[in-house]
Amino acid sequence: MQFAPSICQQCSIGCNISPGERYGELRRIENRYNGTVNHYFLCDRGRFGYGYVNLKDRPRQPVQRRGDDFITLNAEQAMQGAADILRQSKKVIGIGSPRASIESNFALRELVGAENFYTGIARGEQERLQLALKVLREGGIYTPALREIESYDAVLVLGEDVTQTGARVALAVRQAVKGKAREMAAAQKVADWQIAAILNIGQRAKHPLFVTNVDDTRLDDIAAWTYRAPVEDQARLGFAIAHALDNTAPAVDGIDSDLQNKIDVIVQALAGAKKPLIISGTNAGSSEVIQAAANVAKALKGRGADVGITMIARSVNSMGLGMMGGGSLDDALGELETGSADAVVVLENDLHRHASATRVNAALAKAPLVMVVDHQRTAIMENAHLVLSAASFAESDGTVINNEGRAQRFFQVYDPAYYDNKTIMLESWRWLHSLHSTVENREVDWTQLDHVIDAVIAAMPQFAGIKDAAPDATFRIRGQKLAREPHRYSGRTAMRANISVHEPRQPQDKDTMFAFSMEGNNQPTAPRSEIPFAWAPGWNSPQAWNKFQDEVGGKLRHGDPGVRLIEATEGGLDYFTTVPASFQAQDGQWRIAPYYHLFGSDELSQRSPVFQSRMPQPYIKLNPADAAKLGVNAGTRVSFSYDGNTVTLPVEISEGLAAGQVGLPMGMPGIAPVLAGARLEDLREAQQ
């Protein structure tokens, strides 16, 4: 197979992967060792969720609408056609995406101008993202790398179901909790590798873990206590813990004595820990939860603890897009609705996930030109006048920024045009820059990835570090490029024999230091950190990683790839003082509580056929008391209308969900994550 170093695109943690391709299809994803991030482990979403790259219905050539049909264009026609329309438009806006790379979002921003660039994230979600970034940058609290999470000795998870939204963090938390047994063994001078002895000494001793969520989580089995409550009440718990740790933090009134006793236990555990860790994120749909997490961390820091804070975002490049800035999707739709913008370019974004489908469709229908650049067939293509066929992560290069602010580069695995010369799939940044150049009647400036990165750094100093995330295209080892294929790669002459017996030249990669070939350097001892695949003489491939490490289980011999862009400052934020009121259930009104699923909540991996067989069917969760009031049982279909659409789903009963709320699986087909926290008024049994 042909490999390249890449970054997992299915959540915000940024695990390192080696995707393998054969015959123009992605065939598997292997874990790529990074001693600072994921070391030996990947979650199942990352390992098996790549099926969307191989879908047959992906846009493979640019198409333009003619009446009710689309006609296929070549690259030149697409650029000229789009440029003609953009020249006539009085105002062009661009809608970016948290699943597109820094380079692609920047190319769109350059095309439309910084003041016309919108992030493509809903306003509420963007506010939470900016708040999380503010806490990480200015809070004065250290953000640990994924590997470092394992060294903490007390963990508080506020409002985030980490097993479903950042599964690799959940594994790190499990390892952290086990640290108690290792400590006890170390006190008896037992070596770290003697696992049987450590388990024997530790028995069931664990470091304390406290979890808050709207319902049960998969971490409950190792948690000292789980608080199942509406999101506001979870935030109130966080504020109360912060006040108990430091009485200058805002107080919370109206807490009953049972809960106060639990708070005392949590405070004792956190205050007694040397290295407490607070985990929160944007997925609960609440800014107050993030503020509460920041307050707890600040209170612990004030007591002299070596405290860490981890924020989990929603998409692979959410943090990068937050650092870039721009208006929210709601602002962009407002521009289209008022008619002040008459052309819109949408980059790798299914807008139905970030705003109500009715509003998106109405806004796009008003625009004389809708241009979509994407590698998946999304619902908004129904409204598109021109579709540019972009390359997915496996066919392109770029930089993404993970939840801790680590910039990491992913590289192209294969060139799809080698197997089918009718395919015209370019990186989004290439399409957008080519269009920009055509509109301005000038030559293309960015002929390779390094040019884009230099342009990003010149325009946005906050991204200066991305230059160091990986070596540039001129990097060589003993004058050689690095091989993407192991030297036992076989049958290359026969691969295209069904098309033509004349073998064409291998694709030439001018963007990176890799070659689409087995010819090149692949020595384990070579001075490089970007490793496409692990191979060493006498070792089966994935077991060869020990040859690339400075010590077994340590860092890579020549340093782990990636560079941190966010470091905690010396100062700190003041305490957040707005404590939310507690949740009050109201008759005839229900609030949507967010549930997430590792298989199904992510926009791209839910398209993979293997995931579709593992995904739960969409459901609506009710508390038993609410179900009794409505007169429904598990399995009964209930319907509600939201935003002009009627949704009908089967009921599931959950004891953990508080009355007055309904649980929906966020991100599943037809259930946009933007629904979290919305109110429903007309929940009723569906008419058969």
Place the predicted regions along the sequence by residue.
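A glycine-rich phosphate-binding loop feature that marks nucleotide/adenosyl-phosphate handling sites
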Residues: 1-2, 98-99, 283, 313-316, ...
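N-terminal export/assembly segments and adjacent metallocofactor-ligating motifs
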Residues: 1-257, 264-265, 528-543, 547-562, ...
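Short, well-ordered alpha-helix to beta-strand connector turns
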Residues: 89, 152-153, 223-224, 273, ...
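Hydrophobic/aromatic residues located in beta-strands of well-ordered beta-sheets
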Residues: 92, 117, 209, 276, ...
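Conserved short loop/turn motifs at secondary-structure junctions
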Residues: 92-101, 258, 280-285, 348-352
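A cross-kingdom feature strongest in bacterial/archaeal respiratory oxidoreductases
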Residues: 157, 163-218, 330-421, 437, ...
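A glycine-rich, hydrophobic/aromatic-adjacent loop/helix-cap motif
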Residues: 271, 276-338
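Non-catalytic, well-ordered alpha-helical segments in soluble enzyme domains
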Residues: 428-447
